[in-house]
Amino acid sequence: QKLQHLKTKDPLGKKPIYYRGNRQDLPFYDIDLNLLRFNPLNDRIHTDIKEYEQTTGMDFNLLPITKMNTIISEMIWSKHESKNKKTLEDIKRKNQLEVGVVTKDGLIVDGNRRFMLLLKINEESSENRPFRAIILDETYDDDPTSKFNIKLLEMDIQDGEDTKEDYSAIDKYIRVINFVD
């Protein structure tokens, strides 16, 4: 609802993406970080969550969203700390340059790492930097077709750009299992 309200305002610009079988120029907006959450369906994050559940014996989905965000943030930071430190300094200096993608309920489709870094910047400096992103008109939970199309978009974004981090063998395996489900 707050995200949908943002879409009634003038966008900051448009970004081309390939979505639902077409190239589309979709508007993007600055979104308050409090309206967003990490995507536990993201293949890399999902792998870490499964490991967390195995280690702690806890069902991750039963945790409050703020606790989920904190745990996922720590997972992302510690996985590639030196790379994250470099990108953190870059975002501090230049702001967020790459536009992310979120669902209409605030789940991040593309940009989990940038979201984590912006949370860290805001926490350390008491700034209120927003997350710049396209807001999709659907969620993973709307229907199976929506979930399928959003996963295809996520895969296209992750695999379609040279600058994205490579997936490990386990992440690729989990991706295939999750895609088939």
Language-model region placement:
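Short, charged/polar connector segments at secondary-structure boundaries
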Residues: 1-129
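Amphipathic, charge-rich alpha-helical segments that serve as recognition/docking helices
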Residues: 72-78, 123-181
